[in-house]
């Protein structure tokens, strides 16, 4: 068995275990980045022909890759929602302390009397 295929399988399995049900954090993001860089190196070292066992491992890696992509998407959406929430909080905070700074045009009317 090609040791590169087996090590790729183990790394992918470890990464999926780390991502599953993990809260978003800077450490997690840096570990995902490190994993993708390491994985690129591993994929460059994998050359055919493959045995049946290697083919099944690569199929499992492909399946786990789809799951990892979903988890990364979930984390990305969570970060995006946090950024939106923080922007809203900042706007509400500024409006509370300086209510006349940003006036809106709704509620205005024009008096036709001269």
Swiss-Prot record:
Superkingdom of this protein's organism: Bacteria
Record key words, sorted: Bacterial flagellum biogenesis, Chaperone, Cytoplasm
Protein location: Cytoplasm, Cytosol
GO annotation, biological process: bacterial-type flagellum organization
Any single Gene Ontology cellular-component annotation: cytosol
Record family assignment: Belongs to the bacillales FliT family.
Quaternary organization: Homodimer.
Role of this protein: May act as an export chaperone for the filament capping protein FliD.
Name recorded for this polypeptide: Flagellar protein FliT
Gene: fliT
